[in-house]
Amino acid sequence: MHWKRAQKGRNKLRRSLTSRQFEQFVATERGMLVRLAMNIQHHPEDADDAVAEALCKAWERREQLRSPDKMRSWVAKITVNTALSMIQKRKRVELVESMDDYPTTAEPGYPHSGIWHEIESLAEQDRTLVYLYYIYGFSQKEISAILNIPTGTVKSRLYAARQKLKNCR
């Protein structure tokens, strides 16, 4: 009986997440998802492919979303996993992208353009944490769920990344 109630709840959620709501989510968050995938993929075309595939997966698996409040972190996790999976399939990992592809001036809201260079010099796992926490505003708990690592690990890696960035001055 308990299973039927759970299934009924999922069906209700699936019906409640309309294609229009999903389209609104995509319109609002697509830029963040592309930048997140770009942080992993390092190529705009690959990042776009990863996001497109992740959004398809999210739509197909929308009944697995337990709470609409968690949609942003849930889709971000799917995007990260899809981008990493695509790299593994191609057996190609590029760690550093040419700085020519980065803006030479500060982006709106980020007055210190030099920090972008310093962030890019971090190890990939540290850079991903910095982007998720400081740039995209995910909580440490959400990052823990997205990357499948303990919250304590997120905290310690963020601390270490902050120390590295402070020492780069």
Question: Each PLM stretch: what is its role?
Answer:
Residues 15, 53-70, 89-91, 168:
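Sigma70-family region 2
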